Amino acid sequence: MRNIPVADVEDLDRAVLAIGTDYPPQHVLAFHEHRRAQVLYAATGVMRVETAEGAWTVPTARAVLIPPRTPHRVTMTGVSTRSLYIEPAAAPWFPPRCRVVDVSALLRALLLDAVDMEPRYPEHGRDATVVSLILHELRNLTPLPLDVPLPSDPGLRRLCEAFLRAPDIHDPPGRWATALSVSERTLGRLFHRETGMSFKRWRQRACIVHSLQQMPAGVPVTRLAATLGYDNPAAFTAAFKKVLGRPPTAFTTAGRPGPDT
């Protein structure tokens, strides 16, 4: 199925539904939720998925797992998606929180095949086997640390959201502590309690995740490093590898599979 609303088919009696959708540039899907679990795969472009818990960046050729009944907003940058909508009973192992994952070559091929299946595919035969393989393959995907958790504390959340709009790797914790009228030590405890991360680690991940949103536009590493406040491109690349375990080139056109169809 391609370019049809999931609401038109969501109640079909099939464990998995696959839909391919093309979106205009800078398209935003306002907050919504699905009865089914969703696997949202970026065939092209980059997505940013937001929930009350945080924000997840999804580079090209990766996917985000979205639990059922999870309100979320999606910002699209040059995106064509391949989505799976899965009955919760068919995937009891599905994570309770959004998760960005690497997509194996096998799952990618299965996704491309599934979107061209009939909505009410036969429950026995080739298409049912494709669905069964998809469910098996989904269980073993490698998570990527591309989430930026957001605190529930209103004051700290406002500061975090402002930082995400204009991240700076050298933004000092003292500025945040002053804004909240607390000591830096108290800020550190609050940050860890609210996000599960230290201030320094959260700041670095936020910067690296932000850089991924710029890569599809061809922004060079030198400019990304300067914009984020890194001393030089080498420092940015080292930080990138520390967070994601691979260099920026792994997330650019040269490091991705060919275009999906």
Task: Pin down the residues of each PLM region.
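Short acidic-glycine-tyrosine-enriched beta hairpin
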Residues: 53-68
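Short hydrophobic/aromatic patch on the recognition helix
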Residues: 61, 187, 191, 235-236, ...
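Amphipathic alpha-helical segments enriched in hydrophobic/aromatic residues interleaved with Lys/Arg
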Residues: 92-165
